[in-house]
């Protein structure tokens, strides 16, 4: 389980592999940093956009992880379990294209998680002189980490909500997002987003009070309390 402050806030996990960081407005764009492969399909697409002013090459690295988080354990995926195509993309400035991910793993009731790193590489090596006399790249390599969740092939979406104790529990075998907005007129920025994996439980005082509280599962909003008029927030 992990929490994100602000319902509409997106925190990009960017790593500039050089001594000079590029402006974030000109970095790779891949949309939501957590994406899922539904239980009824065996592939999912991820769009990559080149927001730079010159061409870039895009490559992917995949690690299997036990559970997303700061203490996650990364391992090499079983051969053939998760494939992707194409091997790399070459995009001109402003262009976009899709990577496709194909799952050929076990058809069971267990959810699986993968860390997918998108690597953006300049097609040319431009440098400038640093104050110390050395040279640094003016077009760095940028790596953006995302999480791919392969939902169980035998999926069970279940949850429980206890308003008396202010508790939401994931009693199924697949993840969902919980949106908590205190009060009926609070803004998106005042809300919190919680990502609940199987068996995760959230205890929050706000859940005992009136507010717009939703679950988001497969891009669908599920209102869990009737204390406010229905007004679905953004799922970002």
UniProtKB/Swiss-Prot annotation:
SUPFAM superfamilies: PapD-like
UniProt induction comment: Negatively regulated by H-NS. Positively regulated by IHF and EcpR.
Keyword set includes Cell division: no
Coiled coil: none
Signal peptide: 1-27
Keywords: Chaperone, Fimbrium biogenesis, Signal
InterPro entries, per the entry: Ig-like_fold, PapD-like_sf
Role this protein plays: Part of the ecpRABCDE operon, which encodes the E.coli common pilus (ECP). ECP is found in both commensal and pathogenic strains and plays a dual role in early-stage biofilm development and host cell recognition.
Similarity section: Belongs to the EcpB/EcpE family.
Official protein name in the record: Probable fimbrial chaperone EcpE
